[in-house]
């Protein structure tokens, strides 16, 4: 079932799953990340740590997107207001270029 909260996430090419978090709680999940409380906790901690790396003093979050790249997949993290959107996306293999 698609809700307004997740409809954009479900259209991302090569996505393997997603999480929508608010204050560490899972609001929505799907695919490989469905009901993954451990991933939600780790990502919440990662976002909190990244927010501590402010170069300029201010109340704004110091980043818009955060990518954690693994061998076969990438976790794409976007913070919007009080929500954290996480998408697990399959990395595409690059074809060799013939010269």
From Swiss-Prot:
Part of the Ragulator complex composed of LAMTOR1, LAMTOR2, LAMTOR3, LAMTOR4 and LAMTOR5. LAMTOR4 and LAMTOR5 form a heterodimer that interacts, through LAMTOR1, with a LAMTOR2, LAMTOR3 heterodimer. The Ragulator complex interacts with both the mTORC1 complex and heterodimers constituted of the Rag GTPases RagA/RRAGA, RagB/RRAGB, RagC/RRAGC and RagD/RRAGD; regulated by amino acid availability. The Ragulator complex interacts with SLC38A9; the probable amino acid sensor. It comes from Mus musculus. The keyword Phosphoprotein applies. Phosphorylation at Ser-67 by PKA inhibits Ragulator complex assembly. InterPro entries: LAMTOR4 (IPR034601). The modification N-acetylmethionine is found at residue 1. Belongs to the LAMTOR4 family. GO terms for molecular function: guanyl-nucleotide exchange factor activity; molecular adaptor activity. Keywords: Acetylation, Lysosome, Phosphoprotein. One of its GO terms (cellular component) is lysosome. As part of the Ragulator complex it is involved in amino acid sensing and activation of mTORC1, a signaling complex promoting cell growth in response to growth factors, energy levels, and amino acids. Activated by amino acids through a mechanism involving the lysosomal V-ATPase, the Ragulator plays a dual role for the small GTPases Rag (RagA/RRAGA, RagB/RRAGB, RagC/RRAGC and/or RagD/RRAGD): it (1) acts as a guanine nucleotide exchange factor (GEF), activating the small GTPases Rag and (2) mediates recruitment of Rag GTPases to the lysosome membrane. The modification N-acetylthreonine is found at residue 2. GO terms for biological process: cellular response to amino acid stimulus; positive regulation of TOR signaling; positive regulation of TORC1 signaling; protein localization to lysosome; regulation of cell size; TORC1 signaling. Its main location: other. The modification Phosphoserine is found at residue 67. This is Ragulator complex protein LAMTOR4. It is found in: Lysosome.
